[in-house]
Regions:
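Helix N-cap / loop-to-helix initiation motif
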Residues: 1, 162, 234-235
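Histidine- and/or cysteine-centered catalytic micro-motif in compact active-site loops
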Residues: 98, 161, 167-172, 179
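Ferredoxin-type iron-sulfur electron-transfer modules in oxidoreductases and energy-metabolism complexes
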Residues: 128-154, 171-276
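Cys/His/Pro-rich metal-binding microdomains
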Residues: 65-68, 94, 157-163, 167, ...
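Iron-sulfur-associated redox domains of electron-transfer enzymes in respiratory
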Residues: 1-149, 153
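Sequence-level detector for tyrosine residue identity
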Residues: 30, 47-48, 69, 73, ...
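Generic hydrophobic/packing signal
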Residues: 21-26, 161, 165, 242
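Short secondary-structure junctions and interdomain/linker hinges
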Residues: 12, 71-74, 159-163, 249, ...
């Protein structure tokens, strides 16, 4: 969510100046379903044990288990949780900005220079990467052609919860909630007269493709879309696959640097020359 907020700030829909950001090395979060069923409490001992050992936390969001970017990039203060075996007694705070340093002035504690990006963090990242490959195979999303997309989204009931909870969604008014997206009989009649046919994707497929296109550069694969999907569509895996492809092509990691321009607003000479 912090990375997604940075993406919104780049679109002037937020500001980092008036907020102190405290984040942690993240072990993941439990899905909304567990909160509704009120059984998270019984999972917490296992959660903190896995966190302290730097292991994957069972029963967390699948997106969290597959997440390689669990270290905050833009936090003023980072709380070290992962692989902290003494987590119940003490932890380490990394002060990343002057704002973060000013907050702890006068607070007792041991201060020293240190780097959070340690070998241990790389080992955790390797575990997450391997889990991502495994979960992607289980989701059967290696090759997303139109047939696979149509089959995958055939369960969609059109609730559009995914766009409503998406922290990277930046539209003030969703296109699909406006009259512009609704074509009347005259539109189809005109198209038939001009071309002799009307070829189009179903509204459901069109909606999901447009949503993926809009947020692909800024998607942080948080998994909230899958969390609220009543049809249990693996939206987290689809968004991750789409986002990684676009971000790799654009050499861009969303939420890492507030000063880095969005790919869609950055001109690069001879960009994508191999496919143009």
């Amino acid at each position: 969510e912090l990375r997604a907020f940075v993406e919104l700030a780049k679109r002037t829909q937020g500001s980092l100046e008036s907020i102190l950001f405290i984040s942690s090395t993240c072990g993941g979060v439990y899905p909304l379903e567990m909160a509704v069923e009120r059984n998270i409490g019984e999972q917490l001992p296992k959660y903190w044990k896995a966190i302290g050992q730097g292991d994957l936390v069972p029963n967390t969001r699948l997106a969290c288990q597959a997440c390689e970017y669990f270290m905050p990039y833009t936090a003023d203060i980072t709380v070290s949780l992962l692989s902290n075996k003494g987590i119940q007694e003490e932890t380490t705070l990394f002060l990343n900005t002057e704002k973060g340093e000013s907050i702890v002035e006068g607070i007792s504690g041991k201060f020293s220079e240190g780097d959070l990006n340690t070998t241990t963090m790389e080992q955790i990242r390797s575990k997450r990467k391997a889990e991502k490959e495994k979960l992607s195979d289980e989701a059967e999303l290696r090759n997303l052609g139109i047939d696979e997309i149509t089959k995958t989204f055939s369960r969609c009931i059109g609730c559009r919860n995914c766009s409503k909870v998406c922290p990277a969604c930046y539209c003030h008014m969703c296109f699909f909630e406006t009259e512009t997206s609704e074509h009347g009989p005259l539109y189809y009649e005109t198209e038939l007269e001009k071309t002799g046919c009307v070829s189009m994707l179903s509204d459901t497929i069109f909606y999901h493709l447009v949503r993926l296109f809009h947020v692909s550069t800024s998607c942080t694969a948080c998994g909230q879309c899958a969390d609220v999907c009543p049809a249990n569509i693996p939206l987290w895996a689809i968004s991750l696959k789409m986002g990684e492809a676009v971000q790799k092509a654009s050499d861009y990691l969303p939420g890492k640097d507030i000063e880095e321009g969005l790919p869609i607003t950055t001109f690069v000479p001879e960009e994508f020359a191999e496919i143009v």
